[in-house]
Amino acid sequence: MTLRRVRGAVLGSVVFANNKAKLLAIRLTRWTGKSREYVHPKHLLGESEENYWYLSYVAPDASVLDVGCGNGMHSLKAARRCRHVVGVDGSMYSLGVALRSSRDLPSPNAAFFAADLEQGLPVQGGRFDTVICLDLLEHVHNRDLLLTEIRRSLKPGGSMLLSVPNRGTSWKRRLARAGLFSYSDPDHKIEYTLEELEAELARNGFRIVHLHPTVYDTPLIGAIDLVGSLSLGLYRRLTEARRRLARAYPEENAGFFAVCAAK
């Protein structure tokens, strides 16, 4: 076996282990009593500006659309700060979790609907001040349609709060050079460089007005996820260290947190 094949086998084993560790960590957060639902440990950190960067862009009188809301984690945090939230997702299971969790809101200002996001959005045009679209775009085939639909749903002067993965980190480039699938999730249809993201947004009527740092990309992510499922205190310190590294090395950010204005 050549050195290249050995290197590829080792790197492939790391990717496989990271994917399995992430799934296990999500289950352990519930099994260890940290959450009533199966959630990633990152969603159990405190509600600080860095953990939930988008909340500072949600105005008290805003009407918010959460596209790809999943289990409603972000929808419900926004609902505690704004006038009204609508969440849409294609998973009936996740929407069930969101509906159950919404019972804890101080007022019933969140609604959830099922939708095939590959086919558009079942909402009126010009209705929303803000659209949240977090960790979704990379899972969608028909991204131009979805972005056009998001643009249609916004009021004049509205904004989209977007997060997508960065494909240009050192770790991902190393995987790609070895001929391996380098995306951070097996279901991702695309990951972006900043230039690619800007071009896709511009094509669909958006521009980036501000970028927030995320966390430093690392091949140790699976181990870090498992730590989070067992000790949130240690996970918090590791996450803070990854944020410091991301600020120091912007090209190594695991993703892009972007505030996008409709043109």
Each model region followed by its residue ranges:
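Conserved catalytic loop of SAM-dependent methyltransferase domains
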Residues: E118, R207-Y235
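A short His-aromatic
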Residues: D135-H139
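A short glycine-rich, Lys/Arg-flanked "PGG" loop and its adjoining helix->strand segment in the class I
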Residues: D144-P156
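Conserved beta-strand signature within the Rossmann-like core of class I S-adenosyl-L-methionine
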Residues: G158-V164
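Short, glycine-/aromatic-enriched active-site segment of Class I SAM-dependent methyltransferases
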Residues: N166-H188
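Short alpha-helix
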Residues: K189-N204
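Conserved Class I S-adenosyl-L-methionine
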Residues: E240-V259
